[in-house]
From Swiss-Prot:
Functions together with ADGRA2 to enable brain endothelial cells to selectively respond to Wnt7 signals (WNT7A or WNT7B). Plays a key role in Wnt7-specific responses: required for central nervous system (CNS) angiogenesis and blood-brain barrier regulation. Acts as a Wnt7-specific coactivator of canonical Wnt signaling by decoding Wnt ligands: acts by interacting specifically with the disordered linker region of Wnt7, thereby conferring ligand selectivity for Wnt7. ADGRA2 is then required to deliver RECK-bound Wnt7 to frizzled by assembling a higher-order RECK-ADGRA2-Fzd-LRP5-LRP6 complex. This is Reversion-inducing cysteine-rich protein with Kazal motifs. N-glycosylated. The lineage of its organism: Eukaryota, Metazoa, Chordata, Craniata, Vertebrata. The gene is RECK. InterPro entries: CC4_RECK (IPR056978), EGF1_RECK (IPR056976), EGF2_RECK_dom (IPR055134), FnI_RECK (IPR056977), FZ_RECK (IPR056979), Kazal_dom (IPR002350), Kazal_dom_sf (IPR036058), RECK (IPR039016).
Length: 971
């Protein structure tokens, strides 16, 4: 029954997502189908509200979002409402004859997969044999045909209409004009919905996308022909238009010996009609997974991995060898975790599972594969195990009757293996060794164990650790979540992913304009990192990928172009990863992290990179302890700020000199107090606009100008990018503000609580004119008033520096706060202290646009990896030369669950940095981040922790929440 309900609900979601649905204007009319359905939920007001929104929605994207969220409010046990919603829509129950994926089987690359496909009756039947990571064409075809079959169900009992419709979706080539015309002739009078549904697919049919052949343009010998070719493929749709355009643009007739036309002919004569044959892309078949190959500990696995993901498909033997020697080898945990990050990144939250229900309602836990397919997979695994044997790639484990012996434990194991909970720090997903040993001792058929094997030896192969930082204790999932159904405090708009396969989901931090309803996420165009890659990056971004041949330490930087392809790739100098560092007479290999006193260090290609904290040790004398300030070079805690050429304000000249600045490279006064446009450095036809920035690249090479020169325009564009001036007047954009002779206060709409220009001190030691001005610079506020103290850097520091500062009270419940380095006041947040390789940043800047790389760029990139809208990213460059990243709850009164979510996001990002995961390292300039230390606001049983009170104790948290919600779109 549960399966039926799930399939009905799935059909409804699928149907409404792909086909136009007649929508009701305004509310639901009494007696309408929608009203009758929603009456089934009269005892559940939240479900009723969602139901009414579904039937009255006028936006297809809004409808899709509501349907994805509906199971949260209308559980599957409400059979009547789900049956009613399905039955109120035509075509849902009709099942097509045969499996629609049958016509796709010839697209399978591996012979075993092709055979399994021909014998299958559903996608589930091939999931064990066919690998999604390199059978992209097959799975895309199946998914498209499954969705297309919904269109044909609108034909009802009209045989001719149904057959012509099915002919479109059962072919593995692009449907021709005659096929589409036949559907229109036979179906137009029967079902307009069917015609609309078919048109949606035929107009966007992906298998014959002209841009897939852009690489052919590079074969043209004439530069003008190359440009014409690219322009034509980007703008023309039909083959006739493209051929005519190429003849005209290249001034040549189609000749088989011409490299350009030869390339087009080869792609059109593919062995699989309709599937464009690409040359090996410049990124390899999968640039993200290729990044992981260098993490292999054995040369065998490194070579196999490189063979599989570089320039040519690995054969079946290569895959089998990789499975046998590498896929389950504990020695290769670093490479395997990296590959898992690419295939299935750890994401916060799990819900809506019907079998693995103990995994539901866990909004602050990380999972790799919390979805319906994995839920079904766990149930299927249990059925197989009930036959008395657990088949692993390298060993078969005989077991007793698991229906009678610890069934709940076995279910937790099956679900853990499929849903894959992962640690925020290690990102490991294996169960703990003690659980493995316990279950095999109780329920393993030990008389039939393979020769020389015991429960302990088998578990040594499967789950070699009991370290709770690296394994999952099953006890967690033997009972439901204690949170029940209270999940709205923390939401996950992009999990599960609501976007099409070629688009990237981003959290909507803009809010809704003028209070109108809108989606909590955006789907943005992106590029895949190779032909076989599912790893998508945002259009317009710079990406670092390994060289396509897979040489260790060799990378290139590419841009994600408008065509959806990586382009303009530039080779970087190879890094010698064999170089080691000598520390205290001991050799440290590349990538090794370790501590020296209170400092954290990392060896990066032979260079030792360490934090520059001043340390006290157990051997420090009493005089040392008495004079210890905790500041760099033990400088006095005097606050006489100076502005460095890198755009950073330092508390004193002593500290500026200590971090390496010469006397001519800083001047007295804070950077914010300087006017970079006086005297005017721009030409007469240009306007000077202040642009404060803190630069991480070498100043002498790339500069760090605090202004930009923009052309003076007679008429400004009407683009909506609101800014607020110093008189608290709002303007459409910067151009209109300066055209009216005003001065910028901050970016974003004017906020009522920032009308009074009361200064605030940011965590970076800079005084801002208002809370809003600080937030628009991605800097969180430490306290109200001008900056007046150096702040606390060490647990051994004196708190006398902050004695005169009045800190706001903490209004968060159950939080043991942290104090960011250089700040005075406590904060409930997750904090990262990150070291970076300055040489790598300089190399990136040199290879790309020759411009300096700033702290703001780093923060904006990190922000894209925080998936919970209830948390946002702020940060600064500390006086100890670390990038400090703060992940802060944005609600006015953050709940303990929200603080925990921000902590988990911080721990996740720390792990991705420390492991050099392609999830982050593929993004320029995040690839220069080397090592991170995390500190989180731990939970305490009391209702809250309060700092020293002040008259601003209520105002600052309220301002924080409001400003974050309203300003985050503009920064």
């Amino acid at each position: 029954m549960a399966t039926v309900r799930a399939s009905l609900r799935g059909a409804l979601l699928l149907l409404l997502a792909v086909a136009g649905v007649a929508e009701v204007a305004g509310g639901l009319a009494p007696g309408s189908a929608g009203a009758l359905c929603c009456n089934h939920s009269k005892d559940n007001q939240m479900c009723r509200d969602v139901c009414e929104q579904i039937f009255s929605s006028k936006s297809e994207s809004r409808l899709k979002h509501l349907l994805q969220r509906a199971p949260d409010y209308c559980p599957e046990t409400m059979v009547e409402i789900w049956n009613c919603m399905n039955s109120s829509l035509p075509g849902v129950f009709k099942k097509s004859d045969g499996w629609v994926g049958l016509g796709c089987c010839e697209l399978a690359i591996a012979l075993e997969c092709r055979q399994a496909c021909k014998q299958a009756s559903s996608k589930n039947d091939i999931s064990k044999v066919c690998r999604k990571e390199y059978e992209n064409a097959l799975f895309s075809c199946i998914s498209r045909n499954e969705m297309g079959s919904v269109c044909c169900s609108y034909a009802g009992h009209h045989t001719n209409c149904r057959e012509y419709c099915q002919a479109i979706f059962r072919t593995d080539s692009s449907p021709g004009p005659s096929q589409i015309k036949a559907v229109e002739n036979y179906c137009a009078s029967i079902s307009p919905q069917l015609i609309h549904c078919v048109n949606n697919y035929t107009q966007s049919y992906p298998m014959r996308n002209p841009t897939d052949s852009l690489y052919c343009c590079d074969r043209a010998e004439d530069h003008a022909c190359q440009n014409a070719c690219k322009r034509i493929l980007m703008s023309k749709k039909t083959e006739m238009e493209i051929v005519d355009g190429l003849i005209e643009g290249c001034k040549t007739q189609p000749l088989p010996q011409d490299p350009l036309w030869q390339c087009f002919l080869e792609s059109s004569q593919s062995v699989h009609p309709g599937v464009t044959v690409h040359p090996p892309p410049s990124t390899g078949l999968d640039g993200a997974k290729l990044h992981c190959c260098s993490k292999a500990n054995t040369s065998t696995c490194r070579e196999l991995c490189t063979k599989l993901y570089s320039m040519s498909w690995g054969n079946t033997q290569s895959w089998q060898e990789f499975d046998r020697f590498c896929e389950y080898n504990p020695v290769e945990v670093s490479m395997l975790t990296c590959l898992a990050d690419v295939r299935e990144p750890c994401q916060l939250g799990c819900r809506n599972l019907t079998y693995c229900t103990n995994f539901n309602n866990r909004p602050t836990e990380l999972f790799r594969s919390c979805n319906a397919q994995s839920d079904q997979g766990a149930m299927n695994d249990m059925k197989l195990w009930e036959k008395g044997s657990i088949k692993m790639p390298f060993i078969n484990i005989p077991v007793l009757d698991i229906k009678k012996c610890q069934p709940e434990m076995w279910k937790a194991i099956a679900c853990s293996l499929q849903i894959k909970p992962c640690h925020s720090k290690s990102r490991g997903s294996i169960i703990c060794k003690s659980d493995c040993v316990e279950i095999l001792k109780k329920c393993g058929d030990q008389n039939k164990f393979p020769e020389d094997h015991t429960a302990e030896s088998i578990c040594e192969l499967l789950s070699p650790t009991d370290d709770l930082k690296n394994c999952i204790p099953l006890d967690t999932y033997l009972r439901p979540s204690t949170l029940g159904n209270i999940v709205e405090e923390v939401t996950h708009p992009c999990n599960p992913n609501p976007c099409p396969a070629n688009e990237l989901c981003e959290v909507n931090r803009k809010g809704c304009p003028s209070g109108d309803p809108c989606l909590p996420y955006f789907c943005v165009q992106g590029c895949k990192l190779g032909e076989a890659s599912d790893f998508i990056v945002r259009q317009g971004t710079l990406i670092q990928v390994p060289s396509s041949a897979g040489e260790v330490g060799c990378y290139k930087i590419c841009s994600c172009g408008q065509s959806g392809l990586l382009e303009n790739c530039m080779e970087m100098h190879c890094i010698d990863l064999q170089k080691s560092c000598i520390v205290g007479g001991k050799r440290k290999s590349h990538g090794t992290s370790f501590s020296i006193d209170c400092n954290v260090c990392s060896c990066f290609a032979g260079n030792l990179v360490c934090s520059t904290r001043l340390c006290l040790s157990e051997h420090s004398s009493e005089d040392d302890r008495r004079t210890f300030t905790g500041l760099p070079c033990n400088c006095a805690d005097q606050f006489v700020p100076v502005c460095g050429q890198n755009g950073r304000t330092y508390p004193s000249a002593c500290i500026a000199r200590c971090v390496g600045l010469q006397d001519h490279q800083f001047e007295f006064g804070s950077c914010m107090s300087k006017d970079p446009c006086n005297p005017n450095p721009c030409q007469k036809n240009q306007r000077c606009i202040p642009k404060p920035q803190v630069c991480l690249t070498t100043f002498d090479k790339f500069g760090c100008s605090q202004y930009e020169c923009v052309p003076r325009q007679l008429a400004c564009d009407q683009v909506q990018d609101p800014v607020c001036d110093t008189d608290h007047m709002e303007h459409n954009n910067l151009c209109t503000l300066y055209q009216r002779g005003k001065s910028l206060s901050y970016k974003g709409p004017c906020q009522p609580f920032c009308r009074a220009t009361e200064p605030v001190c940011g965590h970076n030691g800079e005084t801002y004119s208002s809370v809003c001005a600080a937030y628009s610079d991605r800097v969180a506020v430490d306290y109200y008033g001008d900056c007046q103290a150096v702040g606390v850097l060490s647990e051994h520091s004196s708190v006398a520096e902050c004695a005169s500062v009045k800190c706001p009270s903490l209004l968060a419940a159950g939080c043991k706060p942290i104090i960011p380095p250089g700040a005075c006041c406590p904060l409930c947040a997750g904090m990262l202290r990150v070291l970076f390789d300055k040489e790598k940043l300089d190399t990136i800047a040199k290879v790309t646009n020759k411009k300096p790389i700033t702290v703001l760029e780093i923060l904006q990139k990190i922000r894209m990896h925080v998936s919970v809208p209830q948390c946002d990213v702020f940060g600064y460059f500390s006086i100890e030369s670390e990038i400090v990243i703060l992940i802060i709850p944005v609600d006015h009164y953050p709940k303990a669950l929200q603080i925990e979510a921000c902590n988990k996001e911080a721990e996740k990002i720390e792990s991705l940095i420390n492991s050099d995961s392609p999830t982050l390292a593929s993004h320029v300039p995040l690839s220069a981040l080397i090592i991170s230390q995390v500190q989180v606001s731990s939970s305490v049983p009391s209702a809250g922790v309060r700092a020293r009170p002040s008259c601003h104790s209520l105002l600052l948290p309220l301002s924080l929440g409001l400003a974050l919600h309203l300003l985050w779109t503009y920064n």
